[in-house]
Amino acid sequence: MGSDCGCGGYLWSMLKRVEIEVDDDLIQKVIRRYRVKGAREAVNLALRTLLGEADTAEHGHDDEYDEFSDPNAWVPRRSRDTG
């Protein structure tokens, strides 16, 4: 799938099957906490989060906030609505 990069062209992501060993307890915690569908989405979220943090460290905080790649935005919060 392609996405508009804002540069007049498209960026294409390529999926690649990779066999990795991961801590299943950690995967299950990520699945529950961020409500992702499975291990694949948990790993993708982790990788994108790491890249996002690396980009922020390199380029400062000039980038637009993207709530979908912010893991804290996925944490369920209790409503404080009293009325």
From Swiss-Prot:
It comes from the Bacteria. Residues 58-83 are annotated as: Disordered. This is Uncharacterized protein Rv0634A.
